[in-house]
Every structure is written in structure tokens, then in C-alpha cells.
Design a protein with these regions (language model features):
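Residues forming the flavin
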Residues: 1-59, 65-198, 202-546
């Protein structure tokens, strides 16, 4: 296999996979000095947008080419000109795979708690290994979860167990399904291929900034859960972890679950528990603390959602080529380093998306962002965040970060009017230190409505001060970012977990053998791809322990 990188292509000649492959074959024949008949296969491996020069926005492509024989491939690589040599390399075709079925699988099922991406991929990995895992999820399957969210949006009745945070697919299902990751791992390709097999669009295999969309993700995670069941696993919904059982040596011996508030606790025996509960399962972290499971504070981030007209972001990013059908809605990623030593940064940017109601606790309001697959909404939105370090917390309690989140969410609920309206403020008013009274040209998309106010009292002072310092600096990096009528909606508190469930190199909780803390909630991931990767890692660690 040969990889060819840094192939420039115009917007008109590389709009879709087929046109990209035409470009790739033409370039491969020139660089590798081969004939059409000598190319056995060619695949588009990566596609990104180069918008550094607004007059020359174009695609950068990379391809993987297989010739008809290894000998021919070696000759082709050796014949590459000096000018192109840095763009061509021979690679091994050793794509990662799920583990094969283990011999002498134990009768006792391993248990996975949480059906977000970490839990789903942990359970799928165990199922592929023939271990028939039990996957328990406190929320609903995807279609019933959608009904619970609709009820919240229409009647303002929050279901604490089935909402934007809880249910099949976890928090990522209804927050766009972005598959960006800042790390490289061989498992990423396996995860993307699994998503495609489950119904995700093929372009996630090569798009440099892949996303699935909140309209497609429910079907995808449903298909993955069904595959787990086909392989002998069991998936149980509306099943909540209420206790863990630990023997005198500190090892896991089982768990207790509950299917409803008034149901009796059901004991489940297991010596292997993957805990992938997500960052919003605060009751689980309290349970772990009660059982003296090792926890630690970690840096997390909080702030607001900021909204701009998507057309303005497109023009700022793509210039005169904004609106070209091959480009779609423009994303952005920004950071400003401040004189006070802190930073303000964008996170989870949703092109053509909307701000969503992400609450999971009564009288505690938080927001997130989401896009459908088409990304064709009128506004762009992103979280605008500032880090909260352990030094910012009032004490060394490992749950102090959770209590700060809760305090901010309770304040946001009150500021919004105690009716699930979100507090909102215009950027110009926020910078001037005055409350807002009405929107400008940018209309907020938060679906339950907003209350115009000042958001200061819903956030720690260091975050408010940093946002005020950072917005004008970000406006210098992306034209119009600090426009006076851009909308700030509060509060964004769930971007990352404020705790770490401490584990060793073998993925065991350091205090509790048999417990495998996993994913974003445990402090080992930050998004769909890293969570899924950690799910596979923990499952492989469990398999190695058998």
C-alpha cells in the first residue's frame, strides 16, 4: 500500500468522493509513474479545507493506493521524483480489528455501566470477544429518549433519567456527533468504520473534521446496541446503578441496580465492572466517594454558548467563496491567551446548529450545542470557555468541582426565571457590564426561550473577567466575533468532567481491583472518539485479566 499526501484540488474538481478519486488516480499515475491497469485500488484517506488564503480556498487530499503487486509498489515508490518524495510513503496495510473470541469464556458476564460511546464500544469489544456482556443504561433507548426530550421542550417536564445527557448514545447523541480528536490512535479508523457499518455517512472516513449529526446518530447507536445483542450481549435500559459491592480486600464482587424509584434493588454478581457512566452521573461519583474509591479533582472548563449568523462566519473564514456548495457551513476553533494568565477558548463548535437544553437535574439549567447532518441552520454556535483548575476550588473535596457546576446551574435557572428559560445577554452589553433587554439581529436558538439579563452571577468571577478580556481578542482573530449583538446563552458547565476516578496503567481503579473507570466521566476522554477509544482500551484490559 502506498500513501500519497498533500494533493491540492479546487473546490469544483473535488466536491464528492467520486470526483476526489478521479483527481487521486490522475495524481497517482503521474507521481508513481504507473498505468491505469496497474492500479488495483485507490481510496480517499483524508480531505481537509485550506482557507489560509481567502482568494485560494481549496481542498488538500490524501489517498491510499494499492498496485497489482508488492514488487510494483516498491518500484513505484523508488521511482518517485525528488520533488514529490516527501508526499509518498509505503505503508503496511494492518488496520486494527476487534479481538477474536476468547477460549474458555467465563460464565459470569462482565458488566458495563453506561451506554454512551465509551460504554457502547467497551460492550461491543467484549461481545466480539465472546464474553456476552451486560450493558446497563439508566436512560432510554434512542427513540424513547427522543420522546422524553420532546416532552421537556414542549411541556417543560424534565425526566432526570432520560434527557440530553442520559440514554443510549450518551451526551454525544444529541450534541452534533462531532468526531474530531486531537490525538492519533490506530483504533480511530476501526471506530469510524464501525459507525459507517451502523449507518453513519461514509464521508466520516476521510473528512478532516468529521461529524454525523444529531438526526442520524440515534439510528447509529441503536444499530451498535443491536449488534451487541446479536453477539450474545444483553442491553438493559431504565436500569440504574445504585450500589457497588466490594469485599474485604477492596475488590469488586457485584452491583445493585434499580429499574424504577420504587422498585426493589436487584443484585448482580460480577468481578469485572467497566464504569462508563458519563460526566453528568453525579450520583455515581458520590457513590464512589462513599465507598472510598480513589477520586481526584481535575481541571475542567465552564462558560457560555456564543451565537453568530452562520453566513458571517462563512465570509470570515472563506471570503468571496463563502456559500460554495462544496464547502458547506464553516467551522472555527479559537483561543486567546490573556494577560491574567488564563485562556479563553472555543469548544464543540456547531456550524449551522442550535443551542440545546442540556439539563439533567431539576432546577439546574445548562446548555450545549448541536447540529443536524446538513448543518443548515441560520446560526453558528460554540462553547466559549475558561478553565477551572483545582486551585480555583474552595476546598480539596474531590467533588468540589461538581458542587461548583451545580451552583452555576442553579443560578442560571433562577436568572432565566425558574421556568427553564435560559439567561442570555448580548456581547456588547456583556462587555459594557449592563443587562440586556432584547435581541439585536442575531436571534437566539435555545428552544425553550431566553430571559434577557446579565449572566455575571451565574459564573465564577474569574470566568466573567476572562470572557470580558478574551472576546475583543477573539474578534481580532475572526472578524465580527465580538459583534455587539452576538448572543451569549448560559451556562455551559458540562464540557468535561471535574473529577478523575484514578486508575493504573492496566485501567484498574487503583483502590478497587475489578473496577475499570472508563471514558469522559472518569476523566480519561474528551469527546466521542476518545471516549470510544477508551472503551476499547478498558475492554481489552478486562479481557487480558481473564
Amino acid at each position: 500500500m502506498i500513501e500519497i499526501t498533500q494533493v491540492n484540488a479546487s473546490l469544483d474538481e473535488a466536491g464528492d468522493e467520486n470526483t476526489c478519486l478521479i483527481v487521486g488516480k490522475r495524481v497517482a499515475k503521474r507521481i508513481l509513474r504507473c498505468k491505469d491497469s496497474e492500479i488495483k485500488s485507490i481510496e480517499l484517506h483524508r480531505k481537509s479545507i485550506d482557507a489560509r488564503k481567502k482568494r485560494d480556498v481549496h481542498f488538500i487530499l490524501s489517498f491510499r493506493v494499492e498496485l497489482t503487486s508488492p514488487h510494483l509498489e516498491r518500484e513505484a515508490v523508488d521511482s518517485v521524483s525528488e520533488r514529490d518524495r516527501s508526499r509518498v510513503r509505503a505503508i503496511e496495510d494492518d488496520e486494527p480489528s476487534f479481538p477474536s473470541p476468547v477460549s474458555d469464556a467465563p460464565q459470569e458476564r462482565p458488566v458495563v455501566v453506561g451506554a454512551g460511546c465509551a460504554g457502547l464500544f467497551a460492550a461491543l469489544t467484549l461481545a466480539k470477544a465472546g464474553l456476552k456482556p451486560l450493558l446497563i443504561e439508566r436512560g432510554d433507548p434512542a427513540f424513547r429518549r427522543s420522546h422524553a426530550i420532546d416532552l421537556f421542550l414542549k411541556e417543560r417536564i424534565l425526566d432526570p433519567e432520560s434527557n440530553i445527557q442520559f440514554g443510549l448514545g450518551g451526551a454525544g447523541t444529541f450534541s452534533d456527533g462531532k468526531l474530531n480528536t486531537g490525538t492519533k490512535n490506530p483504533a480511530h479508523r476501526l471506530i469510524l468504520e464501525t459507525f459507517v457499518e451502523a449507518g453513519a455517512p461514509r464521508d466520516i472516513l476521510w473528512d478532516a473534521k468529521p461529524h454525523i449529526g444529531s438526526d442520524i446518530l440515534p439510528k447509529v447507536v441503536t444499530a451498535i446496541s443491536q449488534r451487541i445483542e446479536q453477539l450474545g450481549g444483553v442491553v438493559r435500559y431504565r436500569t440504574k446503578l445504585v450500589d457497588i459491592r466490594i469485599d474485604a480486600s477492596g475488590a469488586i464482587t457485584g452491583i445493585d441496580v434499580q429499574s424504577s424509584e420504587d422498585a426493589a434493588c436487584e443484585p448482580i454478581e460480577t468481578k469485572h465492572l467497566i464504569l462508563a457512566c458519563g460526566h453528568s452521573a453525579r450520583d455515581i461519583f458520590e457513590l464512589l466517594k462513599d465507598h472510598n474509591v480513589a477520586l481526584a479533582q481535575k481541571t475542567f472548563a465552564m462558560g457560555v454558548r456564543i451565537e453568530h449568523p452562520q453566513r458571517d462566519i462563512d465570509r470570515a473564514q472563506y471570503g468571496a467563496l463563502a456559500g460554495h456548495p462544496a464547502l458547506g457551513a464553516a467551522p472555527y476553533k479559537l483561543v486567546a491567551h490573556l494577560p491574567n494568565g488564563r485562556s479563553v477558548f472555543s469548544f464543540c463548535m456547531c456550524p449551522g446548529g442550535q443551542v440545546v437544553a442540556a439539563s439533567s437535574e431539576p432546577c439546574h439549567l445548562c446548555v450545549n450545542g448541536a447540529s443536524l447532518n446538513a448543518r443548515d441552520g441560520r446560526n453558528a454556535n460554540a462553547a466559549l470557555l475558561v478553565n477551572v483548575t483545582p486551585e480555583d476550588l474552595p476546598n480539596d473535596d474531590p467533588l468540589a468541582g461538581i458542587e461548583l457546576q451545580r451552583a452555576c446551574e442553579a443560578a442560571a435557572y433562577r436568572l432565566g426565571g425558574s421556568n427553564w428559560n435560559a439567561p442570555a445577554q448580548l456581547v456588547g452589553d456583556f462587555l459594557a457590564g449592563r443587562a440586556s433587554k432584547a435581541p439585536g439581529k442575531v436571534k437566539p436558538t435555545y428552544p425553550l426561550g431566553v430571559t434577557w439579563t446579565a449572566i455575571d452571577e451565574a459564573l465564577p468571577q474569574h470566568i466573567v473577567e476572562s470572557l470580558r478580556l478574551g472576546l475583543p481578542l477573539l474578534g481580532k482573530k475572526l472578524r465580527g466575533y465580538d459583534r455587539p449583538d452576538a448572543v451569549l446563552t448560559g451556562v455551559e458547565t458540562r464540557s468535561s468532567s471535574p473529577i478523575t476516578v484514578t486508575r493504573d496503567r492496566t485501567c484498574h481503579a487503583v483502590s478497587t481491583p475489578g473496577l475499570y473507570p472508563c471514558g469522559e466521566g472518569a476523566g480519561y476522554a474528551g469527546g466521542i472518539m476518545s471516549a470510544a477509544t477508551d472503551g476499547i482500551r478498558c475492554a481489552e484490559a478486562l479481557i487480558a485479566d481473564l
